[in-house]
Amino acid sequence: MELIEVKKLSKSIHGKEILKDISFEISQGDCVALIGPNGAGKTTLMDCLLGDKFLTAGEARIQGLKPTDNHLKQSVAILPQENTVVEDLKVKELLTFFQAIYPNSLSNQEVDDLLQFTDKQKNQLASKLSGGQKRLFSFVLSLIGRPKILFLDEPTSAMDTSTRQHFWEIVNQLKKQGVTIVYSSHYIEEVEHTADRILVLHKGELIRDTTPYAMRSEEQEKHFTLPLTYQSVLEKLDNVTDIEIKQKALSFATREAGQVWQVLQENGCTIEEIEVRNRTLLDSIFETTQE
């Protein structure tokens, strides 16, 4: 039996179908990224897996139990999209409170290693932390009870680059400890650094279940940028897409770069006039996510 099992899960809200016939399984120790455009259903799927939303159809099981089963409380932790830190308490007070809740909580040293806060930061009100610090603090609070399964919704939002990289290090430590992690993300680097698997959602449907490496290895599009003077040449080609005019440059995409380049050369284009870059399916998905 897999740790997390989802079978033909569907969810409708006010008559609108948000999730459509979704099925997948997650093994213990997997780190799985949910990606897709805004409104794809990532947060709703997490809510269903956590028992915060009832299913319209299908089923979900965690450790063989329904998500609403109280026996899961000690093994499952959640970092919601919005921080839920009590801001009028000091950082150290919140840490002490959370440590008192769990019978086998993280030690002060373990917390310090994860947070990397100064004594001054720990003695100040949580409201005084920066956005990225609050996010990291919320994440560490979710770890204090030593959960075996983590659900993280946009975990690194508001984090700067260094804090985000520290988060990735923590995730990789948790993976080595066998913690199962399911998270949503808008950052391609994050997925490439941490995810073992990728579930791609689009308009409420699970359209891909793959890995970062597999997506990177798939057929690539070439993106060309060249002077506007070649517009008439491109308009005669049927193997180019996404033609855009920006300032005095022309950009387009193609999966038949060799043929297109041959036509451009025949019409006087030189290598010095063009810029070419690769774009994989993974790049395309994250570009859509940013829109």
Name these PLM-found stretches:
Residues 4, 19-21, 73:
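Conserved structural motif at the start of ABC-family nucleotide-binding domains
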Residues 35-37:
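The feature captures the beta-strand-to-loop junction immediately N-terminal to the Walker
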Residues 51, 57-72:
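Conserved ABC transporter NBD signature motif
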Residues 150-154:
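Catalytic Walker B motif of ABC-type/P-loop ATPase nucleotide-binding domains
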Residues 221-291:
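Short, charged/small-residue-rich alpha-helical element at the C-terminal edge
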